[in-house]
């Protein structure tokens, strides 16, 4: 029997960025932090310039002749790159329809679990199909099922809005929720903002009584 192949369990070696002393080219074309061209200078001179400005020398184009480096704050640059990558990943997210199923006689604990599931789906940018399943004669209680779905929509209103109102679909009742694009401003918050605005409006000055000149004799 041939021996089983051995798998390397060691963590993969992370490729370190080509910055500062890791740059091994003797001549470099250097761009300053503000975009100004410093021309072709030696590696040592480029490192001295970066150190004097308390910045990093970063290799940005290794295939150029000579290689191109830029003087910058590498920590800030890396943070911005990671931020852009996250935003691009978020924009490329394909919206899916996730389903949350329940019975119209659901207890509070199970209802809270379904709410938590829906919140996670909505946070990920997915739509939620809320389904109430009927069995046998339970189909007679569509009004209770609709009440349950509208309660769920109310409990999720800060994160979602109704895309399709509750309706019958075969032996089920369904409702579609979609992630809310703009934050919900509740009625109480609107009233508080309006009251605050009224309080900040200065009161008009009170009219003063005109003085009547006394006749001179």
Curated annotation (Swiss-Prot):
GO terms for cellular component: cytosol; membrane. Residues 178-217 are annotated as: Disordered. The keyword Cytoplasm applies. The keyword Protein biosynthesis applies. GO terms for molecular function: ribosome binding; translation initiation factor activity. Gene3D superfamilies: Translation initiation factor 3 (IF-3), C-terminal domain, Translation initiation factor 3 (IF-3), N-terminal domain. It is found in: Cytoplasm. GO terms for biological process: ribosome disassembly. Keywords: Cytoplasm, Initiation factor, Protein biosynthesis. Pfam families: IF3_C, IF3_N. IF-3 binds to the 30S ribosomal subunit and shifts the equilibrium between 70S ribosomes and their 50S and 30S subunits in favor of the free subunits, thus enhancing the availability of 30S subunits on which protein synthesis initiation begins. Monomer. Belongs to the IF-3 family. This is Translation initiation factor IF-3. It comes from Synechococcus sp. (strain CC9605). The gene is infC.
């Amino acid at each position: 029997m041939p021996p089983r192949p051995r798998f390397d369990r060691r963590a993969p070696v992370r490729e370190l960025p080509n910055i500062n002393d890791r740059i091994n080219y003797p001549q470099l074309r250097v761009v300053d932090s503000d975009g100004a061209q410093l021309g072709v200078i030696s590696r040592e001179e480029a490192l001295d310039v970066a150190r004097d400005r308390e910045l990093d020398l970063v290799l940005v184009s290794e295939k150029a002749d000579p290689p191109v480096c830029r003087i910058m704050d590498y920590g800030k640059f890396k943070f911005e790159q990671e931020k852009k990558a996250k935003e691009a990943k978020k924009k490329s997210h394909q919206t899916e329809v996730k389903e949350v199923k329940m019975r119209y006689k659901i207890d509070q604990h199970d209802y809270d679990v379904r709410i938590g599931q829906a919140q996670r789906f909505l946070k990920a940018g997915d739509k939620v199909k809320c389904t109430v399943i009927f069995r046998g004669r339970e189909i007679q209680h569509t009004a209770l099922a609709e009440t349950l779905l509208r309660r769920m929509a109310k409990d999720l209103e800060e994160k979602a809005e109704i895309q399709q109102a509750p309706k019958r679909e075969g032996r089920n009742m369904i409702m579609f929720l979609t992630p809310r694009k703009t934050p919900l401003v509740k009625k109480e918050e609107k009233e508080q903002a309006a009251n605050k605005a009224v309080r900040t409006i200065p009161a008009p000055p009170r009219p003063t009584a005109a003085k009547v000149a006394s006749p001179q004799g």
